[in-house]
Amino acid sequence: MFAIFVGTIIGCITQPMPIGAVSIIGFTLTVLVGVIDTKTAVQGFGNPSIWLIAMAFFISRGFVKTGLGRRIALQFVRLFGKKTLGLAYSLVGVDLILAPATPSNTARAGGIMFPIIQSLSKSFDSDPKQGTERKVGSFLIFTEFHGNLITAAMFLTAMAGNLLAQNLAEKTAHVHVTWMNWFLAAIVPGIVSLIVIPFIIYKMYPPTVKETPDAKDWAENELADMGSIAKAEKFMIGVFIIALLLWVVGSFIGVDATLTAFIALSLLLITGVLDWKDILNETGAWNTLVWFSVLVMMADQLNQLGFIPWLSHTIANSLGGLSWPVVLVILIIFYFYSHYLFASSTAHVSAMYAALLGVAVVAGAPPLFSALMLGFFGNLMASTTHYSSGPAPILYAAGYVTQKRWWLMNLALGCLLYTSPSPRDKARSRMPSSA
């Protein structure tokens, strides 16, 4: 089982063929060699967390189709875009608002934020083809990259890998991670990071244009072209609010996160915001549903067959004599910097999360705290390379930031992340006392 799992993960990383195809081949081999039977293998496709991911993909399509995501972004630019730093904060704010209902940070960064940043940059004659990328474009691109990763770490439903981590935590350490306890643990360090990181980037990599008085006029013109808010956008706002409320209070009224997502999608279909063709055309959701289900099934089998517990105890014994805080820090640092070998955050979570969580728990670390910290860093570790995750190649390929600059600044910001204890301490203090 382990050999097939490793082979599948390597295939997901190197992608000699699409990740879904690699997963199907791995699934077939698992049954063919007799590790498990077909009935057991297909159980992964009934996992509620995986269906939550698919439903949230469909919901996020509503933001794009109705134009609501773009309208929100333009409103932020209109209100806060008089200075370049304020412009960056406004864009990060939009990402923050959209994050809870968008399980693809690639969709947020590439489908909504990147077109806005490109248009803004061009309006200030900031173009890498003309050698003027440093005017505003470089700063906005790099700030959005880091802001996107932070917002992805703040909400359970903001990145597909978070929901995989939730599932693995339940199966590996019997830790029940909910939307609410993830949010409560992440909110303070997340907000602090969203305030501090753009300012640090502003000092490290300052734009040559500090004032952007024309941004407000540009945004107002774009909003005028969009016209008044449409009925479909109003429905989208209403459904989004209902989904957020149910994600927050659902555990108290017997409505879990997956059912909430199904309710939201049903409302979007009933109101006509989305039609069935939209659902069928959301290939990212169906693709994720297939390969995620296979990887979760494999990881679950490794745990049931005793491999993950054995590996966790073996590594924990090699770290014998160290206190659990030291062990957890070592594991997080290893988790973070090993991402240089990965081109997908979700693939990295699939490969290492369960084993590292098992080691932390065996070493005596609080299970929920360990699960959440590794969950957060499953997003933050993508702040390493220009191929680290879906948003990275999209933003890097625009040409506003060179590869050398991208790597060096990420290295510096990564060091800052570990030398500043306050966000981690605050996460610890905000952690719910029970799972």
Where are these regions (language model features)?
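Re-entrant/interfacial helical elements at transmembrane boundaries that shape
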Residues: 106-122, 141, 154-171, 311-313, ...
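Generic alpha-helical transmembrane segments of integral inner-membrane proteins
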Residues: 6, 28, 93, 97, ...
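Conserved small/polar residues in nucleotide/adenosyl-binding loops
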Residues: 418-427
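Intrinsically disordered, low-complexity non-transmembrane regions of multi-pass membrane transporters
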Residues: 122-135, 204-238
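Alpha-helical transmembrane segments of multi-pass membrane proteins
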Residues: 85-99, 125-151, 177-185, 324-337, ...
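Alpha-helical transmembrane segments
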Residues: 48-55, 103-108, 184-197, 371-378
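Membrane-embedded alpha-helical segments and adjacent helix-loop junctions characteristic
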Residues: 20-21, 25-130, 282-288, 292-363
